[in-house]
């Protein structure tokens, strides 16, 4: 039996299908939990950051829909009380919901000339500073992300010493955004 050579477009299509299948299989593999050594290294990394700052204000930029970078910061800021879509999936490819959330946060920052004031609450497991942040006019970034339908409430039972009702305020904003199907809620609710 003679094997005929494939036409270049057919060979390319087969190669792409096989590559995608192997990439999807690799991405579906569960991640191994961190080893005790890795946890210890991460703990040492967080300790190297020093004490939690009392406050921070300065120029900030959006890294993703829930994380800020800023001038003079030793660690990134994770906005308290929200969870936005991940910017990149397990294959490190940016996805549309994550890009929309980051763009929305970037627009909020741009309207305030990137001037941000933050009140840190704690470090998270990734050594980011979890903080409630507001822009120049006093607008709460986390609340604005939730009200715009670009994030939902996350760990809202954690009480902030300076605003005990922040969690309830965020939950109310999420309810209204969901009811009005703002931002990403149509996709999250399966309408699209």
Indicate where each model-derived feature is located.
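Bacterial N-terminal signal peptides
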Residues: 9-21
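Small beta-barrel nucleic-acid-binding modules, primarily SNase/OB-fold domains
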Residues: 2-3, 23-192
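Generic early N-terminus positional signal peaking at residue ~5-7
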Residues: 5-7
């Amino acid at each position: 039996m003679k094997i005929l050579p494939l036409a270049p477009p057919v060979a390319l299509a087969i190669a792409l299908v096989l590559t995608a299948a192997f990439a999807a299989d690799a991405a579906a593999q569960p991640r191994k939990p961190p080893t005790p050594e890795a946890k210890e290294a991460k703990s040492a990394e967080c300790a190297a950051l020093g004490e939690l700052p009392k406050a921070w204000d300065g120029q900030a930029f959006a890294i993703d829909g829930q994380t800020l970078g800023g001038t003079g910061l030793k660690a990134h800021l994770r906005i308290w009380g929200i969870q936005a879509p991940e910017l990149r999936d397990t294959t490190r490819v940016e996805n549309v919901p994550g890009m929309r959330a980051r763009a929305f946060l970037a627009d909020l920052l741009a309207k305030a000339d990137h001037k941000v004031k933050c009140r840190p609450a704690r470090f998270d497991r990734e050594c980011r500073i979890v903080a409630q942040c507001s822009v120049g006019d006093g607008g709460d970034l986390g609340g604005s992300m939730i009200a715009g339908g670009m994030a939902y409430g996350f760990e809202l039972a954690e009480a902030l010493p300076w605003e005990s009702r922040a969690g309830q305020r965020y939950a109310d904003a999420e309810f209204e955004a969901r009811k009005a199907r703002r931002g990403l809620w149509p996709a999250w609710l399966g309408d699209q």
